[in-house]
């Protein structure tokens, strides 16, 4: 484990890490979980939340909501309610977000490219708090206006300011499996020569299952395109705030090195890890 930490730390020092930030980071500052969002969708449809949750998984329930909203008004963007709800919760928690130690530590890693499957602006707010320039990217137009000095925050599943970009229903997830969207092509290029670090994810999160599948496919495509051997693939890591030997085994089978936290408090565990891997700090 010490060897993995040392290699990861060196990769961060050399700006050779793609950081993926998951929903666990946003939830730690009071933003809604998927379960809370599903409850709100049930409320919108006038369905008992317990019954709603019994009738399908999160993606199929979101799909049902999208179908119902489209039938009521085809002009409505189904994800608009989700976007508005998250935006409102973010406004309520702004002080907590801008003072969150974990978010400050993420910014202080100085990773030039951060991917996130979150729709919120926590990362943008954290960069602004520390007066560090960043550019959120959720479509081709954003890519054209990136300055080299800016940290790129790739909104891989959309941004609440752009409801049409949001990936939240079953069909929208399936659409992203084609691997040929502009963001997929960018990811394929960004992966070359870089390690990947996931934080804020667990196997119960559909995003990590999709991402690990997608990344494996993209690596195989890169290997074919550029003649890269499997041995030349940089290491990928996932931080797990709590030990879970089943999840660890699954991640290892997907060529992702699990690094397990040492505290029962998930937030403290994540903070301790981010401190250890920051090459600017003496640990």
Annotated model-derived regions:
Residues 151-173:
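Active-site-proximal helix-loop elements at catalytic-domain edges
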Residues 1-19, 25-29, 40, 44, ...:
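SIR2/sirtuin-family catalytic core signature
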Residues 1-3, 96-97, 136-138, 177-181:
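Short gly/ser/thr-rich secondary-structure transition/capping motifs
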Residues 121-122, 161:
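A short acidic, glycine/proline-enriched capping/turn motif at secondary-structure boundaries
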Residues 33, 100, 168-170, 244:
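Residue-level signal for threonine
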Residues 168-185:
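Active-site glycine-rich loop that binds ribose-phosphate moieties when present
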Residues 1-107, 112-115, 123-129:
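Gly/serine-rich nucleotide phosphate-binding loop at the start of the catalytic core
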């Amino acid at each position: 484990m010490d060897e993995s930490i040392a290699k990861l730390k060196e990769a961060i020092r050399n700006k050779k890490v793609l950081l993926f930030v998951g929903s666990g980071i946003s939830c730690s500052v009071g933003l809604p979980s998927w379960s809370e969002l599903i409850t709100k969708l049930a409320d919108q449809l006038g369905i008992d939340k317990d019954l709603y949750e019994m009738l399908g998984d999160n993606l199929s329930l979101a799909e049902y909501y999208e179908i119902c909203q489209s039938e009521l008004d085809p002009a409505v963007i189904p994800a608009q309610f989700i976007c508005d709800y998250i935006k409102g919760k973010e406004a309520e928690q702004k002080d907590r977000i801008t003072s969150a130690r974990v978010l400050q530590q993420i910014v202080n890693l100085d990773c030039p490219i951060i991917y996130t499957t979150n729709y919120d602006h926590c990362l943008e707010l954290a960069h602004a708090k520390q007066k560090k320039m960043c550019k959120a990217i959720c479509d081709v137009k954003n890519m054209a206006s990136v300055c080299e000095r800016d940290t790129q925050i790739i909104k891989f599943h959309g941004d609440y300011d752009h409801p049409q970009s949001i990936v939240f229903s079953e069909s929208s997830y399936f659409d992203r499996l084609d691997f040929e969207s502009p963001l997929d092509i960018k990811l394929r290029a960004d992966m070359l020569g870089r390690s990947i670090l996931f934080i804020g994810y667990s196997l119960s999160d559909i995003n990590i299952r999709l991402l690990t599948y997608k990344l494996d496919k993209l690596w195989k495509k890169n290997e074919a395109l550029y003649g890269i051997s499997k041995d030349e693939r940089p290491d990928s890591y996932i931080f797990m705030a709590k030990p879970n030997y089943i999840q660890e085994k699954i991640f290892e089978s997907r060529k992702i090195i699990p690094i397990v936290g040492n505290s029962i408090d998930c937030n403290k565990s994540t903070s301790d890890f981010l401190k250890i891997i920051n090459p600017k700090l003496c640990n």
